[in-house]
Amino acid sequence: MKQKIFQILTALCCIFYVMSAQAIDAKKLYGLQGPKLIYQAPVTKSHHYVVKGVSYRTQTSKEASGYARDGIASFYHKKFNGRKTASGQIYNENLYTAAHKTLPLNSYVLVTNLRNQRKVIVRINDRGPFVKGRIIDLSRAAAREIGLIGSGVGHVRVELIQLDRQGRISGAASATLAKLAKNQEAVNMLLQGEDTVELTQHTEEKTVKAATTKPEKYTTVYKIRILNLDSKKQAEKLISKLGREDIRADITVNQDKFDIYFGPFSDKSQVNDVKAQLRKLNYSKPLIVYTFDD
């Protein structure tokens, strides 16, 4: 029995060592402040909770993988320092953490201050902010890093970061991280391109009054997003080569690059058809398929 217990403890120590060894230093690889990035087991079940009469549904890891939102960020008041968070951890204003209403606890996000383009990585370990119009509540350290202390609130972009067991990075933030890579190792950590096309459920943060007795019905809608084109002209050329006048195509500016959104599509077969056409064009830019509830 003692030998068996020893073997189990040894195995657990090995697992802990491997996981620790795979911690990613975002400062070294991408020049970003934040916690060490460590693989977390995927969250496979969502749950509901109610605050101030409003019901929220948390996202699974699969649903959250394409999460990218622009909105208003705030940061914790000093009085919350030392209090317990929704994850059970104690809030420490000097660590890079944040509160979000629906993203999985212990997931990571890249937060960009859209006024000055300063960035920080934070770990979600709490729920909130429960103030209308705000999408994330940052720790004081994170807010300071992106220049929010003076204003108190700011317009930000929040993009999810996901890691697999090998420590490779995917999720909505991967395109932004690719532009920040300091070396080849940083580039190699990112899952991008044709081999990493992902089908991700992009769930809007819809709120329903707790008094509602029947769940609302939503229609699943799909969009295709192509990342990191070098110019608007290149984006327009790709749309022209695709030759699909029946499909809406929107070009958006992403810092010094351009993205294309095709859709919305109400049928997954349409999505697969357009993906196949893009492949025939030998298109190699990162391609993500989003689904969301309309």
UniProtKB/Swiss-Prot annotation:
Keywords: Cell wall biogenesis/degradation, Lyase, Signal
Gene Ontology CC: cell outer membrane
Entry annotated with the keyword Chaperone: no
Residue ranges annotated for the SPOR domain, each copy included: 216-291
PROSITE patterns: SPOR
MF terms in GO: lytic endotransglycosylase activity; peptidoglycan binding
Pfam families: DPBB_1 (PF03330), SPOR (PF05036)
Gene3D superfamilies: RlpA-like domain, Sporulation related repeat
One GO BP annotation of this record: cell wall organization
Functional description taken from the UniProt entry: Lytic transglycosylase with a strong preference for naked glycan strands that lack stem peptides.
Record protein name field: Endolytic peptidoglycan transglycosylase RlpA
Organism: Pasteurella multocida (strain Pm70)
